[in-house]
Structures are given as C-alpha cells and as structure tokens.
Amino acid sequence: MAEKFNLQDRFLNILRTSKIPVKVYLVNGFQTKGIIRSFDNFTMLLENGNQQNLIYKHAVSTIMPESFVRLTSKQQQEGKDSDEEE
C-alpha cells in the first residue's frame, strides 16, 4: 500500500528545517516575511529578526519561499526515473 502523502506538512517541514525565508500572504491582503520556526494543525510560528508572529493557518492565502523547495528526495526521484524507463 502506498505511503500517505501530506503535502502541507512536508512543505512546511522542509521550509522549517532548511530555514528558507518565506513571504506569507494573508486572506486580508496583509503580507509578512520570516522563517517558519514551528507549526501544528492550526497555526505556524513565523520569526523575523527578534519579532515573532503566530499565524492561524485559516488566515493564510499563500506561502512563497525565496528558493525552490524539492518535495521528493533524490532517491525517490531516481526510483521514479528508473520505473519510467522500464
């Protein structure tokens, strides 16, 4: 059986562990920048310098990382490529 894939958690966790700066756009049009320090099912903690923002996920419209985020490991990607060749 295939492993369950949670895109949101994987994306946020990569941003958190890699400390990739992000821009977060809220549904009211407000924009904030920072590094994701932590997140749970309902909130995420964004840090910018010595300022912290606890943002409720239901208020988030878009998260834009400053660099590309690869959601699959190179091993997984190589496995896919070899499957496609067969």
UniProtKB/Swiss-Prot annotation:
Homohexamer. InterPro entries: Hfq, LSM_dom_sf, Sm. Keywords: RNA-binding, Stress response. HAMAP family: Hfq. The keyword Lyase does not apply. Coiled coil: none annotated. This is RNA-binding protein Hfq. GO terms for cellular component: cytosol. Belongs to the Hfq family. RNA chaperone that binds small regulatory RNA (sRNAs) and mRNAs to facilitate mRNA translational regulation in response to envelope stress, environmental stress and changes in metabolite concentrations. Also binds with high specificity to tRNAs.
